[in-house]
Amino acid sequence: MQQIKFIDLFSGMSGIRKGFEQACRKQSVACKCVFTSEIKPAALEVLKQNYPDEVPYGDITKIETGDIPDFDILLAGFPCQAFSFAGKRLGFEDTRGTLFFDVARILKAKKPKGFILENVEGLVTHDRKDPTQKIGRTLTVILETLEALGYYVSWKVLNAKDFGIPQNRKRIYLTGSLKSKPDLSFETTPSPKLKNILESGLPTESSPFIKKLLKKFPPSELYGKSVKDKRGGKNNIHSWDIELKGAVTEEEKQLLNILLKERRKKKWASEIGIDWMDGMPLTKAQISTFYKHPDLQNILDSLTDKGYLVLEHPKQKIGGQRIKDESLPKGYNIVSGKKSFEINKILDPNDVAPTLVAMDMEHLFVVDNGGLRTLTGKEGLRLFGYPDDYSFDIPKKDKYDLLGNTVAVPVIKAVSERLLHTL
């Protein structure tokens, strides 16, 4: 087979490119990237470090197809966006105004031999009006558009942990060829444990929060624990478990643990005539129905003063948003937020990592050297199957942002091999 020329759109860290190149090498096929498009500054810096002789193009929406060299394969990890349906279905034209439109217009103009697209699992049911349908309108239009362009298209949701990566990461992969439909049935590979990719003996962090956490729990007991005040469960540590906001009595702790579960019951919303909200503020009278204590008011006051509880109005659902209804009596609620604490989860080295997303990565910690630390850049790369020699010299915050949005390289490699078989 002669040299395969490919383009890499929405390149990010070039993960799709990496996987495709690995597949080509495995099959002894020469390949060359002739065009790269990316706009994020941190990603452009990483691309410069790894491909110093190449100059990426910018915003793909502003690039004419005539300015793109001829190529054989299109690679793209495009964002999931809804299409605007103005009455009659128009197929290709329905995609206008989205970044998939740019993928489609390039395929239409250049007619390459094939493509590989990657997206979040949610694309499968995105904009689905009927719950009984397997796929939503967005994916339906994408598939119809690709098939109308002459491609035999296959798609499948694949999990990175089935391809040798210790991360539970499901994504949808779409691939198409002008000759035949690529086969996306795979035998799964047992996933390695997180400990297989972790470094050891590195410096740990020592904030007041971490000191309180380690004072209450030895490191080995923290494996797999989440730290948040939104939920209960045996794998969850709450702020009162480590007395983060001040010492708590057994009675106070007992009340908090019961309230955490009770406030989620739908009957409380029904009692005051509002739509159910997950985490209702409850009045003293309501609390007294499930927690009977002669000193209840003092316990509630104490927990409010310390910052474990807040006295607030219930929220009505108005136009899809929750708005405080000041006509309803205030109730006691647990003070919580999605990013309440600097640690969201301590990863279990004997398990696989959860799906890594950009906004959560800096809140994921591992046990090391008798303490706790965040993931290193090298560990982050390994969790997506990047080689250790990949250059990644950018600030930690930017590393987490790029990693949370990148692809699992071994999955791309496997999909690429199937596409190459059709050429």
UniProtKB/Swiss-Prot annotation:
Q: Give GO BP annotations, semicolon-separated.
A: DNA restriction-modification system; methylation
Domain SAM-dependent MTase C5-type, chain residue ranges per copy: 4-423
User: EC number(s) per UniProt?
Assistant: 2.1.1.37
Active site, per annotation: 80
Molecular function (Gene Ontology), one example:
DNA (cytosine-5-)-methyltransferase activity
Task: Give coiled-coil spans as residue ranges.
Answer: none
What are the UniProt keywords, alphabetically? DNA-binding, Methyltransferase, Restriction system, S-adenosyl-L-methionine, Transferase
SUPFAM superfamilies from the UniProt entry: S-adenosyl-L-methionine-dependent methyltransferases
Question: Reaction(s) catalyzed by this protein?
Answer: a 2'-deoxycytidine in DNA + S-adenosyl-L-methionine = a 5-methyl-2'-deoxycytidine in DNA + S-adenosyl-L-homocysteine + H(+)
A single Pfam family, by name? DNA_methylase
Key word Protein biosynthesis present: no
PANTHER family, per database record: TRNA (CYTOSINE(38)-C(5))-METHYLTRANSFERASE
State the function annotated in the UniProt record. A methylase that recognizes the double-stranded sequence 5'-GGNNCC-3', methylates C-? on both strands, and protects the DNA from cleavage by the NlaIV endonuclease.
Q: Which NCBIfam families match?
A: dcm (TIGR00675)
The similarity annotation says: Belongs to the class I-like SAM-binding methyltransferase superfamily. C5-methyltransferase family.
Please report the name of this protein according to its UniProt entry: Type II methyltransferase M.NlaIV
Origin organism of this chain? Neisseria lactamica
Q: Highest lineage ranks of the organism?
A: Bacteria, Pseudomonadati, Pseudomonadota, Betaproteobacteria, Neisseriales
Q: Which gene encodes it?
A: nlaIVM
